[in-house]
Amino acid sequence: MALARAVVRIESNWKTHLTGRAGEVGLMQIKHQTARGQGYGGSRAALYDPETNIKWGMRYLAGAYRLAGGDTCGTVMRYQGGHGARRMSATARAYCSKARTLMASN
């Protein structure tokens, strides 16, 4: 749960109607295409609903967690860069550092 809260804080700072530069939406900044890949059948606009956004964002985060074998940095690397991400970029390292800091403060 601490990791999920950290991801929401990093991605949107709890702003439900935020839109990212690459089309990410809502609290967890999930892309419509990504949610559809997880089985979502609704509209892009519906992903702004906090409950919907968290449901599908958490599904994606859980997949990243499984692929990373539970490793925090591997999880956020795959959440941010896609489930197929294999290399820890400088951006992913910074994201991991932020997530760890936020998790420690909860």
List each model region and its residues:
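Catalytic glycan-binding domains that act on GlcNAc-containing polysaccharides
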Residues: M1-N106
